[in-house]
């Protein structure tokens, strides 16, 4: 039996319509957005390097055909995708991993295995409206669940097979210079040795300008036979801009915490086909554009690239386009692809 993810069709949880639909075009693009009707595993290598990846795939709740029945199958479902993300990610890449609490817990070891460093867990609190009329408190054996997780990870790059803090320490050691001279190089009292060249838990990521000073001093005064120092390619020392690109971005908006009080998606933003669904939503897991915009603007700059591997109705990609970013997304259910693409003004069918 293949371990590859199957087609992502809604089954068993009130699917509103049959997902069968014919498409004239299975790839749509406009210079800012590219949408593929395909398994994302088949197109990752064609996409530009991501600055952010927004994952909203299997939850382990039989949400679609190919989803697992419970959280036990989550690691196997995601592993091939996570491995592909890691091959294309850089130190500047942020992953936003949407899931249930138990789904995220099951996936976390796989994310760590492939180099994703946990940053923070954000909770979407949908409020009591999410369960209104759907909970019998006389029989339920737990508190009603009204939350969903959106967990932030940063890709942890390696240089010379070492993580960044050990690589910095190793490179200075190679120079043959006393570590105390690193403080002189940076114009600091002791922060270079205490923080930037510390391979332990006190390590801090050096600002780009500080890194450039370290590299310049090392290459000017260090053992000539070991040059270049602080080089990623073995030819030239890294520049300040190259070093800055070894860390993911984050811009925290004022007043926002890791608990997002936001009612369930409803109204005009919820995609429906009244003649087919009788008023039901097309996609059970459609995310609000405002939450997608929040995470994209926090972790990318205009013009940077966002991936949406499990597109659904392409909410992350639409938010990315509206925020002036580039988006690459895949969805292999033709109906979802068609309905999502129409949100951009494309006509795929």
How would you name each of these model-derived features?
Residues 1-13, 21-329, 333-337:
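Core catalytic lobe of class I
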Residues 336, 345-348:
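Conserved phosphoryl-transfer catalytic core
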Residues 340-341:
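Conserved SAM-binding loop
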Residues 1, 348-349:
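Short intrinsically disordered terminal tails
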């Amino acid at each position: 039996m293949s371990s590859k993810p199957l087609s992502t069709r809604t089954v068993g949880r009130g699917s509103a319509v049959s997902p069968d639909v014919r498409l004239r075009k299975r790839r749509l693009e406009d210079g800012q957005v590219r949408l593929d009707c395909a398994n994302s595993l088949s197109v990752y290598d064609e996409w530009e390097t991501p600055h952010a990846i927004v994952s909203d795939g299997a939850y382990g709740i039989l949400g679609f055909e190919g989803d697992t029945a419970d959280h036990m199958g989550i690691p196997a479902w995601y592993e091939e995708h996570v491995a592909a993300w890691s091959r294309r990610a850089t130190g500047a890449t942020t992953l936003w991993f949407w899931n249930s609490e138990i789904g995220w817990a099951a996936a976390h070891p796989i994310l760590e295995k492939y180099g994703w460093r946990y940053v923070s867990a954000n909770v979407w609190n949908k409020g009591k409206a999410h369960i209104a009329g759907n909970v019998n408190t006389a029989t339920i054996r737990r508190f009603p669940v009204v939350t969903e997780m959106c967990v932030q990870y940063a890709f942890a790059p390696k240089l010379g097979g070492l993580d960044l803090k050990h690589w910095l320490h190793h490179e200075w050691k190679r120079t043959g210079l006393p570590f105390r001279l690193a403080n002189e190089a940076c114009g600091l009292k002791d922060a270079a040795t205490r923080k930037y060249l510390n391979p332990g838990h006190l390590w801090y990521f050096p600002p780009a300008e500080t890194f450039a000073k370290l590299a310049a001093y090392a290459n000017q005064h260090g053992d000539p036979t070991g040059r270049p120092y602080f080089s990623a390619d073995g030819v030239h020392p890294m520049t300040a801009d190259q070093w800055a690109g070894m860390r993911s971005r984050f811009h925290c908006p004022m007043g926002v915490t890791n608990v997002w009080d936001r009612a369930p998606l409803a109204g005009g933003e919820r995609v429906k086909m009244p003649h087919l669904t009788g008023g039901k939503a097309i996609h059970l897991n459609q995310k609000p554009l405002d939450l997608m915009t929040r995470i994209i603007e926090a972790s990318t700059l205009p013009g940077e690239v966002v991936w949406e591997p499990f597109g659904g109705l392409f909410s992350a990609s639409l938010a990315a386009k509206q925020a002036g970013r580039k988006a690459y997304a895949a969805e292999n259910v033709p109906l979802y692809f068609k309905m999502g693409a129409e949100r951009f003004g494309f006509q795929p069918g």
